[in-house]
Each structure stands twice: as C-alpha cells, then as structure tokens.
C-alpha cells in the first residue's frame, strides 16, 4: 500500500518529503506534489517529514480526502519526477492548514 499526498500540500509544496524518499517516487506539479503508487515502497519515511502533515498511508487517508488516492495516481503519470528538495512556495505558510484547497490545484 502506497502513501498519498493530500489537500494540505496544495499551494504549500514543501519538499522535505522528497529529500528522504529512497526510491524517488514523488512527482511535481505547479503547486502540489504527488506520490506514484506503483513506485512507493511504503517505507513511511516521507510522512513525518511533511511540515503540512499532508501525507498519509493509503489506508489512513481521511474519508473526506479519498479522491486524492486516484489524483496521486493520475498526476504521477503526467508530472515530472522530483528528486531534490526545493524551497516551498512563497505563500506556503499562509496556506498551510487551510481546508478545501482542491479548487486551487494547478495541473
């Protein structure tokens, strides 16, 4: 079972998780990261590294965020792989913790 990036990553895009991933299974969009479910080895190293607490094991994704399981799978097929940490988005602190950010997802 893979890990899943959820709502709170949108418009924050901290990349601390990318830095610790041993299999480079993160993919980067304009304002969101996703995990490729077929590449994730379920090591759980990324989950505690996320300052926004946006990463969950697939079986622990909150009920109101279930759509992110499929979203991660879909976007990982079209976005480029990211393997190194980058600066978060400029207004990440303002968006961290804001609920219901899916409408702000840039594809």
From Swiss-Prot:
Residues that bind [4Fe-4S] cluster: 21, 40, 43, 46
Record's cofactor remark: Binds 1 [4Fe-4S] cluster. Binds 1 [3Fe-4S] cluster.
The keyword Repeat is assigned to this record: yes
Residues that, per the record, bind [3Fe-4S] cluster: 9, 17, 50
InterPro entries membership: 4Fe4S_Fe-S-bd (IPR017896), 4Fe4S_Fe_S_CS (IPR017900), 7Fe_ferredoxin (IPR000813), Fd_C (IPR022569), FdxA (IPR054829), RnfB_subfamily (IPR050294)
Cofactor(s) this protein cannot do without: [4Fe-4S] cluster; [3Fe-4S] cluster
Region (Disordered): 84-107
Alphabetized UniProt keyword annotations: 3Fe-4S, 4Fe-4S, DNA-binding, Electron transport, Iron, Iron-sulfur, Metal-binding, Repeat, Transport
4Fe-4S ferredoxin-type domain sequence ranges: 2-30, 31-60
Gene3D superfamilies from the UniProt entry: 3.30.70.20
GO MF annotation: an example: metal ion binding
Database matches in SUPFAM superfamilies: 4Fe-4S ferredoxins
Bias (Basic and acidic residues): 96-107
NCBIfam families xref list: FdxA_Protbact (NF045490)
Job of this protein: Ferredoxins are iron-sulfur proteins that transfer electrons in a wide variety of metabolic reactions. This ferredoxin could play a role in regulating gene expression by interacting directly with DNA.
Protein name: Ferredoxin-1
Annotated source species: Azotobacter vinelandii
Gene that this sequence comes from: fdxA
